[in-house]
């Protein structure tokens, strides 16, 4: 028997500790606010600090001397995992703890409040009406007339003998619960996205086909999201320029190819207009010059890759070297800064000869050089986040629940004692509107019961004094 009691106590004690110690702590509003502030700070850091970049990038942009803000260096960023904030164990733990706090608050406060508001309550003492902010006494009025008036105004009523209770706007009590539920859905979507999503980048020349391989950030369960059964072909990449020579828009004509190489989808994307296929979204993010096609004298047209040069902040420039002798002992240099078709030609001594356009010939260092075409590369950001639809659902419910929360929960009580009717009410918001409604109900009740004009004036005067007293 003692052993059985000991086993029961070992099971009961942790449950008792949870209910008495842990649950009240989780449901504490101060904890929820603190966690919300921490999440906001972490989100800001993840927005300010570039996510998913290489170590070299952070070493260059966040050096040890001088440290940003006096403490933020590349070592601190890597130590605290600020280079991928939204996928760190500590950030996900904070989200889970915040979700637990919302859940505890819902079950310990919001649901009991809804249950209490949904109960039929009756007042049968004059003192109960005096304790209400709005109350009045009427002679020669009946509960039946009051019940009919309340029902016409959308109140749900219940009568028990000489007592009446009416209420409306119970949905306003449901609103806060749905607010919590929608926030939990948003948190769930964020966690799912962090654990199963990925982010990739590809620089692909026009005319080439690629599969997503350059993954720069991914969740621990993201493997199934990375496309393996289809590839992408860049049919064409081009840039529209303004009359002044500035870039107006980037365009990429993309095709989705199945395993057999057949086209199953096609779309031209540009900035803020991505392509979506099987949960993967491809954004137009960057561009580069991949290569230039040239011909030397009577040789066939051949393709030379172009590399981006370091201009120390002087803008983007790509260059290549064209051999003009079979032993590769001499060559001329070509430079290009955009896809408008202009190429700068330098001779073997490094002297600028001329600026030529695509489709033109030029004599340089004893050879005839033909510039056939500049080939651009599109920079694509490739992303999958299965949690986004869940987050959108949560935000949709959140907006709906906020509107629901603004619905006033109004309650009216009445008690008949001989020829005297006691009426009182309260609401959780829009007090002025509720006061006007009560006055109108009293007006209708007085008219229906043929109460004299002088008596109505006295009634409304007393009621107004009660309102002023409650406001003071």
Swiss-Prot record:
GO biological process, one term: cytochrome complex assembly
InterPro entries in the cross-refs: Cyt_c_bgen_Ccs1/CcsB/ResB, ResB-like_domain
Protein origin, superkingdom: Bacteria
Cellular component, GO, one term: plasma membrane-derived thylakoid membrane
Primary localisation category: membrane
The protein's role, per its UniProt record: Required during biogenesis of c-type cytochromes (cytochrome c6 and cytochrome f) at the step of heme attachment.
Subunit and interaction comment: May interact with CcsA.
Stored PANTHER family: CYTOCHROME C BIOGENESIS PROTEIN CCS1, CHLOROPLASTIC
Protein name: Cytochrome c biogenesis protein CcsB
Gene that this polypeptide is encoded by: ccsB
């Amino acid at each position: 028997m003692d052993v059985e009691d000991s086993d029961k106590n070992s099971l009961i004690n942790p449950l008792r500790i949870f209910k008495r110690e842990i649950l009240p702590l989780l449901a504490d509003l101060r904890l929820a606010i603190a966690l919300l502030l921490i999440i906001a700070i972490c989100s800001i850091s993840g927005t300010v600090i570039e996510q998913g970049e290489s170590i070299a990038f952070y070493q260059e942009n966040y050096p040890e001397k001088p440290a940003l803000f006096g403490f933020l260096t590349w070592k601190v960023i890597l130590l605290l995992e600020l280079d991928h904030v939204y996928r760190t164990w500590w950030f996900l733990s904070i989200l889970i703890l915040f979700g637990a706090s919302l859940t505890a608050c819902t079950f310990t406060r919001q649901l009991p409040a809804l249950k209490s508001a949904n109960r039929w309550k009756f007042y049968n003492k004059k003192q109960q009406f005096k304790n209400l902010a709005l109350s009045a006494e009427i002679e020669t009025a009946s509960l039946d007339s009051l019940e009919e008036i309340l029902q016409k105004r959308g109140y749900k009523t219940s009568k028990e003998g000489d007592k009446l209770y009416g209420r409306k706007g119970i949905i306003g009590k449901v609103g806060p619960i749905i607010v919590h539920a929608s926030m939990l859905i948003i948190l769930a979507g964020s966690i799912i996205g962090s654990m199963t999503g990925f982010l990739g980048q590809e620089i692909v020349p026009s005319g080439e086909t690629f599969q997503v391989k350059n993954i720069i950030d991914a969740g621990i369960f993201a493997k199934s999201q990375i496309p393996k059964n289809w590839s992408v072909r860049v049919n064409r990449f081009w840039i529209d320029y303004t009359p002044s020579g500035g870039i107006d828009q980037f365009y990429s004509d993309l095709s989705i190819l199945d395993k057999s190489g057949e086209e199953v989808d096609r779309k031209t994307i540009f900035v803020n207009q991505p392509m979506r296929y099987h949960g993967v979204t491809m954004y137009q993010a960057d561009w580069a010059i991949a290569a230039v096609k040239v011909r030397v004298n009577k040789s066939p047209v051949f393709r030379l890759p172009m590399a981006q040069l370091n201009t120390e902040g002087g803008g983007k420039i790509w260059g290549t070297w064209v051999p003009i002798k079979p032993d590769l002992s001499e060559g001329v240099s070509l430079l290009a800064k955009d896809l408008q078709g202009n190429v700068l030609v330098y001779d073997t001594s490094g002297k600028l000869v001329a600026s030529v356009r695509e489709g033109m010939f030029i004599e340089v260092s004893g050879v005839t050089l033909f510039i056939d075409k500049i080939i651009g590369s599109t920079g694509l950001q490739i992303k999958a986040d299965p949690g986004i639809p869940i987050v959108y659902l949560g935000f949709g419910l959140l907006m709906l629940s906020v509107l629901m929360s603004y619905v006033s929960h109004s309650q009216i009580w009445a008690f008949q004692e001989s020829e005297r009717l006691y009426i009182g009410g309260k609401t959780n918001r829009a007090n002025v509107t509720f006061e006007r409604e009560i006055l109108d109900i009293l007006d209708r009740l007085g008219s229906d019961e043929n109460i004299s004009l002088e008596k109505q004036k006295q009634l409304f005067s007393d009621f107004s004094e009660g309102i002023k007293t409650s406001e003071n």
